Amino acid sequence: MLNSRVVDTPPRTSRRIKLSLMGPAFIAAIGYIDPGNFATNIQAGASFGYTLLWVVVWANFMAMLIQLLSAKLGIATGKNLAEHIRDRFPRPAVWAYWVQAEIIAMATDLAEFIGAAIGFKLLLGVTLLEGAVLTGIATFLILMLQKRGQKPLELVIGGLLLFVAAAYIVELVFSRPEIAALGRGMLIPDLPNRDAVFLAAGVLGATIMPHVIYLHSSLTQTAGENSKADRYASTKLDVAIAMTIAGFVNLAMMATAAAAFHFNGYGSIAEIEQAYLTLQPLLGNAAATIFGLSLVAAGLSSTVVGTLAGQVVMQGFVRFYIPIWVRRTVTMLPSFIVILMGMDATRILVMSQVLLSFGIALALVPLLAFTGNKELMGDMVNSKLIQILGKLIVLVVIGLNAYLLVSLI
């Protein structure tokens, strides 16, 4: 039946179906290039040059597989990950999962919101508090698009993702990294000291985002008129394109920081504002301005995605709904508190990414269990190879977290 349908579908129509179903992965991918990534990648590149590029490469491959599994769960079952946990786990475990998922979502939003505020401060010369107010207004305006349906939001967020990617192509041209050394950094694993382990955990936490694991399964769970086969075929292409773009941006961030800072004697740069001000004399005003614009674009789009993920988490785990503007208002409060207390914003960004890395396994374990369940997934159940790869990812994440805890004690 499926084969005959594929044969009978005209190629142009099939392409239109694939294109019309693409978009959810671009929303998820924004979570992989948020300001937390800027902070960790800049610090990693400035401190260790190209040494930690391999972490970005492997984390991005892991992220591709994870997001594909999340999307597949929504397509195959019509339910998202949080709903499946609610239906199958004991009530105390469900509440515990909900609490940790909300904490992860708030830590994520803290990084994204403050990052956008820093971007406005650098570009417009306003205070960080004024930048936060501008960020709040802008995110409310973007969230209003949701009233028009999911597709307009996908287009806007996808456009912002492409803008950030284009910005970093320009930054790479300005910084002129050494290609051979860059290639070695991407291919040869190395963790020279405890600081490198800390930053590697931060890069992992910034690259694999627990909140978008929950969100992606929600974005694909609505059936529509297309078959599961069509939707899954489109999703594979969607994930491949979106996550490749996100992976390139992360590599470009770290490579630019390495070329511009580490190899010019600025290895101690650890703050986004410091990076912006140092870029001006090193690479020119244009490079610094593009950096600031990309930070604002990444911050605004990712904080919107974080708000959507928070809604999915709350509704999925505890069936409780609050208006999205209420959630947006509440989740802005920690960012304003951090700013008003005068805390180190970039340090908060990096610490939030390390915290995120501890939430990855908690989302991955049930995701693997559900997508490996033949009764639940039917023909879309994971193959043995996918299950093995998924378990290896869980072990890597848990191992890195354990090593990090021991290193910090």
Curated annotation (Swiss-Prot):
Family, according to the entry, reads as follows: Belongs to the NRAMP family.
User: Corresponding gene?
Assistant: mntH
Q: Does the keyword rRNA processing apply?
A: no
Which Pfam families did the record assign?
A: Nramp (PF01566)
Q: What does this protein do?
A: H(+)-stimulated, divalent metal cation uptake system.
Organism lineage reads as: Bacteria, Pseudomonadati, Pseudomonadota, Gammaproteobacteria, Enterobacterales
Positions of transmembrane segments: 19-39, 46-66, 98-118, 122-142, 155-175, 196-216, 241-261, 290-310, 320-340, 348-368, 388-408
| A GO molecular-function annotation | metal ion binding
The protein's matches in NCBIfam families, at most eight in alphabetical order, are given as: nramp, Nramp_1, PRK00701.1
GO BP of this protein: iron ion transmembrane transport
Please give the superkingdom of this protein's source. Bacteria
Any single Gene Ontology cellular-component annotation:
plasma membrane
Name recorded for this polypeptide:
Divalent metal cation transporter MntH
Membrane-topology annotation of the record: Multi-pass membrane protein
Q: Which UniProt keywords apply?
A: Cell inner membrane, Cell membrane, Ion transport, Membrane, Symport, Transmembrane, Transmembrane helix, Transport
| Main location group | membrane
* Compartments where found: Cell inner membrane
